[in-house]
From Swiss-Prot:
Belongs to the DadA oxidoreductase family. GO terms for cellular component: cytoplasm; plasma membrane. Its cofactor is FAD. One of its GO terms (biological process) is D-alanine catabolic process. Coiled coil: none annotated. This is D-amino acid dehydrogenase. GO terms for molecular function: D-amino-acid dehydrogenase activity. Keywords: FAD, Flavoprotein, Oxidoreductase. Gene3D superfamilies: D-Amino Acid Oxidase, subunit A, domain 2 (3.30.9.10), FAD/NAD(P)-binding domain (3.50.50.60). HAMAP family: DadA (MF_01202). It catalyses: a D-alpha-amino acid + A + H2O = a 2-oxocarboxylate + AH2 + NH4(+).
């Protein structure tokens, strides 16, 4: 049995990995020269099982209106009459109801916790070096209102069996000593001990080598021109390297999956939500974060690699605009300077932007399509690195017919109504 996976970001890569473990002869196609050269290249670096939450949440519509007027707001919207964006935004607003938020978050936590198990097993079986740490995430709050609001999430964490610890300001400083000088800016925190960190790009390079050793073929520098269908199934994929034929096909092209599937008359609600990051070399380890610190006010994550800090945040609805405006640089620079001002050489900061493939309800699209041998694994938003291993494993189970309690409600048919 043969499988073709379109896309070699962390989600496509792990789709290929688990398909080959299930006995498939796998070919991966990507337009870049290496794996993870796009959205997976310089993401936040956080593997946030406990922080897996939909952006569509109660109170977000009101917050979004306020953020439009704030200089360092976590959400920016570029005015547009794009019908895809308008439909996507309408669906997102509908998912801000508490009842839908609870369903969506529960699904996301289930995928994330399954992914934790898969990544743990992967580390046990293979010697993978990606500057990974297993020291948790500290979500910090600057207002009493934020402390109170977290209670609704704690109930869902308990329901999913996700460990957590409420922390006072003193406990936050004990967990992250680098915050000591700014303790007066904090009101408390929520610690998620099972969360991890790591350089997604390094992980992908390691996994590409392992996959090649297991027989997976990678066609880099190869553009997908068209997916060809006859009747109710795909018969081939046209690329600039020729035609590819397989028994099953997986679309894992992040935000670019939407346009490709549209050629087949398949509509998916995945829209590019632009994010930004900076990477700064550490000059004083005692002043740097130990693991990941998540600033709830600005929705910015600060993650520790071995000798670097990765700072990532901002959600911008601007289509596929690759520009990095100075205002966006200023926001993420402001947060790291505010919390860890003496940690690194900010003159050497490297900025990056990527397009997160976001669904309106936050849950990815994993599973079947109207064409019987075509599958999707996309729409993970900010949680591709967090959910990649679990998503790849779940997809392989769906394709091979193995049943799992975590499969329900993940495919695109949940948007059919």
């Amino acid at each position: 049995m043969k499988a073709v996976v379109l896309g070699s970001g962390v989600v496509g890569l792990m789709s290929a990995w688990y398909l080959q473990k299930s006995g498939y002869q796998v070919t991966v196609v990507d337009r870049q020269a290496r794996s993870a050269e796009e959205t997976s290249f310089a993401n936040a670096g956080q593997i946030s099982y406990g922080y897996s939450s939909p952006w569509a949440a109660p109170g977000i519509p009101q917050k979004a209106l306020r953020w439009l007027m704030e200089e360092h707001a976590p959400l920016k919207i570029k005015p547009s009459l794009d019908p895809q964006l308008l439909k996507w935004a309408t669906q997102m607003l509908a998912n801000c109801q508490l009842s839908r938020y609870q369903v969506n978050k529960a699904r996301m936590l289930a995928i994330a916790n399954h992914s934790r198990e898969c990544l743990s097993q992967l580390r046990q079986e293979h010697d993978i070096e990606y500057q990974g740490r297993q020291q948790g995430t500290l979500q910090i709050f600057r207002t009493q209102k934020q402390l109170i609001a977290i209670e609704k999430d704690i109930a869902l964490l308990e329901q999913s069996g996700t460990r957590y610890q409420r922390m006072s300001v003193d406990e936050c400083i004990k967990q992250e000593p680098g915050l000591a000088a700014v303790s007066h800016k904090l009101t408390g925190g929520l610690y998620l001990p099972d969360d991890e960190t790591g350089d997604c790009y390094l992980f992908c390079q390691q996994m590409t080598e392992l996959a090649q050793q297991q027989g997976v073929t990678f066609l880099f520098n190869t553009n997908v021109k068209k997916v060809n269908a006859q009747g109710n199934q795909v018969v081939s994929v046209s690329t600039d390297a020729g035609e590819l034929q397989a028994d099953v096909y997986v679309v894992a092209m992040g935000s670019y999956s939407t346009a490709l599937l549209a050629q087949l008359g398949i509509t998916i609600p995945v829209y590019p939500v632009k994010g930004y990051s900076l990477t700064v070399p550490i000059t004083d380890e005692s002043q740097a974060p130990v693991s990941t610190v998540m600033d709830e006010t600005y929705k910015v994550a600060l993650t520790r690699f071995d000798d670097r800090i990765r700072v990532a945040g901002t959600a911008e609805l601007a289509g596929f605009d690759p520009a990095i405006p100075e205002k966006r640089k200023a926001t993420i620079s402001m947060v790291v300077n505010d919390l860890f001002p003496h940690s690194g050489d900010f003159a050497k900061a490297e900025f990056w932007t990527g397009f997160r493939p976001m669904t309106p309800d936050g849950t990815p699209l994993i599973g079947k399509t109207p064409l019987k041998n075509l599958y999707t694994n996309t729409g993970h938003g900010t949680l591709g690195w967090t959910m990649a291993c679990g998503s790849g494993h779940l997809l392989s189970q769906i394709i091979t017919g193995e049943q799992s309690e975590n499969q329900a409600g993940l495919d695109l048919f949940r948007y059919a109504s």
